[in-house]
Amino acid sequence: MDVVGENEALQQFFEAQGANGTLGNPTLDTSLLEEFLGNDFDLGALQGQLPDTPPYSASDSCSPPQVKGACCPTLTPAARGTPAALLHSANAPGILPAHQSHSSSEMSNSGLPHRTFHNCYPDASHLMSPLDQSVSGGIGCSYHQQPLCHSPGVSLPPTKKRKCTQVLEDSGDCHVWTHHSRPMTGRSHSIEVQDLDSERQNMMLADQPSPALKWQPYRSVPWHSLLNSQYEKLPDVGYRVVTDKGFNFSPADEAFVCQKKNHFQITIHIQVWGSPKFVKTQMGLKPIEMFYLKPFGVKVEATNQIIAIEQSQADRSKKIFNPIKINLLADQVTKVTLGRLHFSETTANNMRKKGKPNPDQRYFMLVVGLYAANQDQFYLLSAHISERIIVRASNPGQFENDIDALWQRGQVPESVVCHGRVGINTDAPDEALVVCGNMKVMGTIMHPSDSRAKQNVQEVDTNEQLRRIAQMRIVEYDYKPEFASAMGINTAHQTGMIAQEVREILPRAVREVGDVTCENGETLENFLMVDKDQIFMENVGAVKQLCKLTNNLEERIEELEIWNRKLARLKRLSSSKSSASEASSISKFSRALSASSPKRTISKKNSKVSFSGKKQSCPNWVFQSLVITLIAVMAFCLKDQDRCTPSAPSSNLTSSQEPALPSTASPSAPNTTLATTLPSFQVPEITFCEILPCQQTYCCPIWGTRRGLSSPMQRQLEEQEPHQGPWAGRSTSFLAAEAQTNVDWRSDWIDTTISSIQIMEIQQIIDRRYCSRSLQCGSGNYYYHIPVNKYTPTNVKFSLEINTTEPLIVFQCKFTLGNMCFRSKIEAKGMESQQEVSQEMTQGYQHIWSLPVAPLFDSGYHFRVAAPDLADCSTDPYFAGKFFTDYFFYFYRHCV
């Protein structure tokens, strides 16, 4: 019967209690009735006291909306039609055709219409079309909105009492979307809603004892925009989905698990800004007739495959869930709860293998979408999708027993013990702990090292460890994407070693860990891993050996420095002794001459005239003065000759056996050069005929003069030569004799000889065929006489390439430019400035020198190949062949 006042309500209460036989029960709680009798009749006041719980299966399809001091308008049955299915439109994505269900079931047996609130559970059920074929009928929901009005005089059908939802006005749900009085654009509001949604979700996750199912926006098809009556675009709809119950998180599966027999429940919060009147489609603006909510499932591996959602009925049967029709008021939050829902299918590969999760496990995802309806078309406004879900036919709790049994609470507080092997990102750990991925350790990793636990302790050979480390190859590489993904490796580019190569050098540092399967199914049999601790200890031994070698080298360097100081001191002593011995020899020689002077009589038989030594001979002091003067002149000549003649072959371009470069030349005087003193046999000439035409002879009269030039290093050497004195040869011989009693110095120094010499432009090799016959070609000094073909033009470039087997330094100590060969003096003067050699030193393995050979009739060059920091152009020639090697090149134009 309809309740219209206190008497009718009281009568209805007593009739119900009397029929059930509970009126005399002392435990009967009549507080609700007393409060109702004490207040004015208000449907909203009565419903406000009901708890906020989802509807149960025996109740009506939808709870009446909570009203506070307002009335509810009556809806005619024609206005309450609910679509039975949502179908995709062929010409517009996201548009679903709707078919109105019959409204004959909306009338009760008493002839009165159903409750005039929006019906959230249509009775009609139809299959869905391709977009959401999982749509089901018979929906259970709690539907709330603010504010709603109730028309006076409306009668309510007698139904079972059920919980109602609370009014969202002044409730905790109102802070989800904060509406500003100022206009808001869709984009700014969407960002704000997402931020508030994430904060709300985080707060809920913090309050809940177990993880909650997470949701995110789902845009499988474009969302449509809403417009008001002024054709102004409204901000995006505020949309949030919360999972109430039905899903349990499984740590073993790393996913939420839902039992197909148990129902789940979700709550949707919807906020509309402004008053939406139109929806923007590809066909233009369409008026909005109604809003619909529709949940469905999709497969993770194929999101185009739809999983239908079912709902439990009062008789425990299940029916396909149909979209529910909702009414969204302007600038209000609408809360809709969908309960008693089930997935129509279970996920594939749910069976476990040996009590462990199946590696081929399949997953579902739940989608809840909001649509705007226009005639028979539905347009998607917003949708959210959940994370992956496993749907099993049995209780998921039974799968956790075998996992939990391995973990026990330890004896130490706040400790957990696992008796077995632990694998992270792997289902087959072969060690106590196997981690597939990166691992961060903020502390230290300790290893057992107590001597009481060790035996057979032996010292290792550090020299052998150094040899093994020197053989190991360090490489950069990239892991294959399929392997890195399977192993959880984020950084594919690494630096390290190859296990196969390490096994050949250090077998105990490589281990086989079995077969490894990549993400693409490829199996790596007997996968190898490297024990870097073993390699680290090898490095420690190698460093110790290097320290020993360094100490030995330092000791030898100190000894060499001591020997160097001793040699320098002996050299100075030898020079001073030689000067003293020379002075003493001169005095002795003068005394010997004076002692051997004749004091006898010279007679002639024919004339019989005799000269008496006492009477007719000159005084002794005259003879002594004459002898001393002669000896002084001889000594002066010897010194002058020593100054003019160099003490070593490195100071002259040629020796006395072969004439030097001419000092002067004139047109009337013929050219006298080394070319006239060459041996009779012929050596290969430097010719450019293979690359240039050889038609003209360049052996013209010589206009220029010989010019001897020296580099700055040579000038420094010449400044030091006067201080060496003429006794450098004696000092050198003394040092050579001293060195013969010691070890061979050459074994300690770098080889300073040249491996190859060639003219780069014509690839002409300069070898021992060009060695001088009259001068030595070895023992630290090499002399080369190189003839140049007479057809060689005067403007070609000569590049001398010197190659060494060690990283050495090549000094150009001296060069001598001989006679120029041009047709006129003007041409000769034009080339004067281009003949200067400016390069002083090169270093490395390859040394290239550009020499002005072509413009000159003859020229000479002195190069010194030295070890770094051991010699230069000023080094004593005695060390030739030890610290450096001298090379002399004499180029001349062969005009015979």
UniProtKB/Swiss-Prot annotation:
Name the Pfam families on file: MRF_C2, MYRF_ICA, NDT80_PhoG, Peptidase_S74
Residue ranges constituting the Peptidase S74 domain according to the UniProt record: 449-557
Write down any Gene Ontology CC term.
nucleus
Which portions of the chain have biased composition (kind: Polar residues)? 648-658
Membrane topology designation: Single-pass membrane protein
Asked if rRNA processing is a keyword of the record, the answer is: no
User: Which residue spans traverse the membrane?
Assistant: 622-638
Where would one find coiled-coil regions in this protein?
Answer: 541-573
Location comes to: Membrane
Q: Name one GO biological process term.
A: positive regulation of DNA-templated transcription
Q: Which residues bind DNA?
A: 111-403
Where mainly located? membrane
Coiled coil listed as a keyword:
yes
Q: Which InterPro entries does the record cross-reference, listed alphabetically?
A: MRF-like, MYRF_C2, MYRF_ICA, NDT80_DNA-bd_dom, NDT80_DNA-bd_dom_sf, p53-like_TF_DNA-bd_sf, S74_ICA
Record's keyword terms, sorted: Coiled coil, DNA-binding, Membrane, Transmembrane, Transmembrane helix
Compositional bias per record (Low complexity), positions renumbered to this chain: 659-672
Q: Which GO terms describe its molecular function?
A: DNA-binding transcription factor activity; sequence-specific DNA binding
Which top-level group of life is the source organism from?
Eukaryota
Q: Which residue ranges are recorded for the region named Disordered?
A: 648-672
Q: Which family does it belong to?
A: Belongs to the MRF family.
Q: What is this protein called?
A: Myelin regulatory factor-like protein
